[in-house]
Amino acid sequence: MDGRWQCSCWAWFLLVLAVVAGDTVSTGSTDNSPTSNSLEGGTDATAFWWGEWTKWTACSRSCGGGVTSQERHCLQQRRKSVPGPGNRTCTGTSKRYQLCRVQECPPDGRSFREEQCVSFNSHVYNGRTHQWKPLYPDDYVHISSKPCDLHCTTVDGQRQLMVPARDGTSCKLTDLRGVCVSGKCEPIGCDGVLFSTHTLDKCGICQGDGSSCTHVTGNYRKGNAHLGYSLVTHIPAGARDIQIVERKKSADVLALADEAGYYFFNGNYKVDSPKNFNIAGTVVKYRRPMDVYETGIEYIVAQGPTNQGLNVMVWNQNGKSPSITFEYTLLQPPHESRPQPIYYGFSESAESQGLDGAGLMGFVPHNGSLYGQASSERLGLDNRLFGHPGLDMELGPSQGQETNEVCEQAGGGACEGPPRGKGFRDRNVTGTPLTGDKDDEEVDTHFASQEFFSANAISDQLLGAGSDLKDFTLNETVNSIFAQGAPRSSLAESFFVDYEENEGAGPYLLNGSYLELSSDRVANSSSEAPFPNVSTSLLTSAGNRTHKARTRPKARKQGVSPADMYRWKLSSHEPCSATCTTGVMSAYAMCVRYDGVEVDDSYCDALTRPEPVHEFCAGRECQPRWETSSWSECSRTCGEGYQFRVVRCWKMLSPGFDSSVYSDLCEAAEAVRPEERKTCRNPACGPQWEMSEWSECTAKCGERSVVTRDIRCSEDEKLCDPNTRPVGEKNCTGPPCDRQWTVSDWGPCSGSCGQGRTIRHVYCKTSDGRVVPESQCQMETKPLAIHPCGDKNCPAHWLAQDWERCNTTCGRGVKKRLVLCMELANGKPQTRSGPECGLAKKPPEESTCFERPCFKWYTSPWSECTKTCGVGVRMRDVKCYQGTDIVRGCDPLVKPVGRQACDLQPCPTEPPDDSCQDQPGTNCALAIKVNLCGHWYYSKACCRSCRPPHS
């Protein structure tokens, strides 16, 4: 009894142990494996557990980041179970992936998409091979909603194919880079891990908060620009997210050079083609319209970081004022304190002194306190503001008006944008001395010292350094800087310089009635409180003069000079041209009187009229929308058919880039999806004649024969008009007599005497080397394709050639072959008579053959052309018959075309349709470059750009 109980306990213990062990292998998160049957107490059930992982597969790429995978299988076993929780299924994934071979590929090699397209070069399509290449450039974001579709096109652009891209193909997934895995674009995080969603912040730090860098933006505008090269800005080493954009379309050309003056592109008065350049350790993308008729802007962008300083140059070709913006991001050194927001300006003498800090006229912190002279080190810009100290800036008074406005913002936030409608004003004014108002307040004595205005800046620049001349010229270059932390309103509206003469009365010629040190008004500001009034007194050797600087313009106490009566002023910006994504705001010059009243433009000098200023403006995010192609022709030429059109979800993803996206986006936006099919009704077909295709011409070369086709009525034969019955036969001419048989070399022998065969290929070719069907050559003279081989001497035996084609194209037929009695004599094949081989042993020369069932294509007559001039379309019905029944078994490879273009006489020239306008925001220039005018969407969105030249 005790022994039986002890044995039973051990049995239960082992069973429970097995169940517990089964539970412990159930791990993982998600599962794509089969589920188990439910377990019932005390019944047979299936236990599941994972097997071992297989070895990692070979990497899908040799470089550039491929994919490798490994699998495991869910194992199962039937066994007795007890009530309670058990191992009901294998949980977790049965396949996992990881990146491999992530090192960069050689820059001069083919891309992975190119390799995949080239692999189709050996494939035969419609009887011939093609040279394939990717349809879109590698750096072009795919317009398809399926980024892991491989789009290839032939070199001549006549054919296209689309197949799933191989695993490891790079793809774009929102703001993450991705890689194709099993036809789906999977993300790669900034940590380099597949399926990771870690992203870079604006400073290029993985999972950073954007606080470790400074964002620098600026505008470059220069009036009365001289011809040749000028420096736009200097970009220090370590910069990332670089963007230089010419905002105003002109003949100017952007160029890029290093600090030593070596040009990477567009240097030495030569224009390079827009493309990607490997510069300073990063890829610099340079783009511009190829001619003046193209839309788009010229720009330079680079992801960075750069490993050396770069100088951005502009080649001015017509002397007009350029308008260029630049921006980049710099990492902040760990020990650097964040710079206080400052406003300051530069002054440069007629001798073109360098921008090394000695020419600083002063700066005003946001809290109103006054500091001494500062160098550009406070900005963390590598001790330089706009260029290398050794470069000739050419910023003298003769250069006219120039503004370099720079926004520097730490923390990765967006800058408020360039000043709106204001800037440095340079005008010539002849007037009388200005006197101060009683409300002018004197400031601290340090404000009158070099701590705010240096002696060079005021005495030398304004008064001529020791001269008591009463005529002087003020024509300064102002560089306004604004940084993060600036108050929402302008800190220093304008500094106006007035002059009081204490040594008797006398008029002064003031060439430039005021100088704006800062005219920046922060965009979208709700408050515009000016900087508190300040003034200062300066004593110079030019006499006992008092110079007051204040922030409010003072009313003139005497008459206004004619030269100062009227001036040009930029209007306020017009509304943004785009309601979503990025648009353009424009400001235009208007003529105003000295008191600010707008007058007719004829009062101002037309030669000094400023050009309009165009700036980008950001709108809200564009909503997805449904786009439809045009309706197709009716599927039938008579009776009831269907019309179809393509319906896709599109969204403006970025300025100039309108792309198809997943339909889920439009559905989530609750946009009503347009219908894709509708019924179309044509006049009733009625009885009509239908014809099969013409038979093959059997005439020999130089001879004539007849080809035939079957004619049938779509209904009862009596109902079709016999007068319109198509002809059922016509004459044909055999091929030219230049066809000749061509043979290849003999292949190896397959065996010994009596069994050995050697084979060669026999072709029928034209005089220019094209291979044509054998029926076009004389079959009586066709060389043998099979010879006996083996020993040097071999007795006579039967040798059969290859079977000829079946004598019918469908159903039951007969095929033939040539059977010869041959021997080998001294290694040479010779033909012998049949009895020497034994007629009873002769292989058959004919055999029954079967082709596909006798389905046959029939077509109706062609319809009228859809147009009376130009290029139209004509159609016909195509049906498959087996006897009198319409079936689906016909060979699709030989199906007759049911739609054909009809090219008639040219249409009369018509004036351009002014209503045909390109959709705003669509990059039509890019659509033309990549041959997308034939695409249904771009033909509509870019209808003006895609018009034929004669229209």
From Swiss-Prot:
Sites carrying sugar chains: N87, N367, N428, N475, N511, N524, N533, N544, N731, N807
Mutation effect (G811R): In GPHYSD1; leads to the reduced secretion of the mutated protein
Impact when changing P147L: In GPHYSD1; leads to the reduced secretion of the mutated protein
Annotated S-S bridges: C59-C100, C63-C105, C74-C90
Signal peptide: 1-22
Leftover remarks: There is a significant increase in total and active TGFB1 in the culture medium as well as nuclear localization of phosphorylated SMAD2 in fibroblasts from individuals with geleophysic dysplasia.
Related illness: Geleophysic dysplasia 1: An autosomal recessive disorder characterized by severe short stature, short hands and feet, joint limitations, and skin thickening. Radiologic features include delayed bone age, cone-shaped epiphyses, shortened long tubular bones, and ovoid vertebral bodies. Affected individuals have characteristic facial features including a 'happy' face with full cheeks, shortened nose, hypertelorism, long and flat philtrum, and thin upper lip.
Designated name of the protein: ADAMTS-like protein 2
Phylogenetic lineage: Eukaryota, Metazoa, Chordata, Craniata, Vertebrata
